[in-house]
A protein has these predicted regions:
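Extracytoplasmic/periplasmic sensory segments of membrane signal-transduction proteins
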Residues: 1-92
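Solvent-exposed, extracytoplasmic
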Residues: 27-50, 78-94, 112-168
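Hydrophobic beta-strand positions
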Residues: 56, 110-111
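Short clusters of small/polar residues that mark proteolytic maturation junctions
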Residues: 68-69, 97, 122
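Glycine-centered tight beta-turn/hairpin loop motif at sheet-sheet or coil-to-beta transitions
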Residues: 99-102, 116
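A short beta-strand signature within small-molecule sensing/ligand-binding domains used
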Residues: 101-110
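A conserved mid-domain beta-alpha-beta active-site/ligand-binding segment of alpha/beta enzyme cores
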Residues: 169-173
Length: 173
């Protein structure tokens, strides 16, 4: 299930990397023309993806767009080693990581136009759809993040902790 989720997230992120509006935004350094709310709403309605976050980062490591907050314009590459790696290598990266908000699946795909590197698009998905699939098979999963990450998770998506272990799936019982 994890590999399937990563592959699906990667495929969706690749599709976004081909978006002409996205490429124009990056060429003109104008994140205001990017809006993926309809895409996210459609995926929530028509797929198991219920909580998708999208971030667009220019070639200099500056966030032009985030779907889950209005914050943008910061040099995200200063604090995200994975972003630094992709900006340098210009190759896609798939990972599972724990950050400020949650334990997530992250896919970062480089964006090119006429072989010119413009930046990256990142899709972040969560463990809830996997938990839902397991529940449908009468398995009650609890995805825990080690308590050593408690101070790092400053805006927890689920807001649920058990003995300082963060619970990453909303439907944990």
């Amino acid at each position: 299930m994890i590999t399937s989720k990563q592959n699906d997230t990667n495929a969706l992120t690749y599709l976004l990397s081909q978006d002409i509006v996205l490429k124009n935004a990056m060429k003109n350094n104008d994140g205001s023309i990017i809006d993926y709310s309809n895409v996210i709403d459609g995926l929530q309605t028509k797929s198991l993806f219920k909580n998708i976050w999208i971030q667009v980062i220019d070639k200099d490591g500056i966030s032009l767009y985030r779907s889950w907050t209005k914050k943008h314009g910061d040099k995200i590459s200063k604090v995200r080693l994975d972003i630094q790696e992709v900006l340098k290598s210009q190759k896609e990266l798939l990972s599972i990581s724990t950050g400020k908000f949650d334990m997530t699946f992250k896919t970062i795909v480089p964006i090119f136009e006429d072989k010119k590197f413009l930046g990256v698009v990142e899709m972040i998905t969560h463990f809830n759809s996997i938990a839902k699939k397991l529940k449908s098979k009468n398995i009650d999963p609890v995805f825990l993040v080690d308590k050593s990450y408690k101070e790092k998770i400053i805006h927890p998506l689920t807001k649920l902790f058990i003995d300082n272990y963060y619970v990453a799936n909303k439907n944990a019982s």
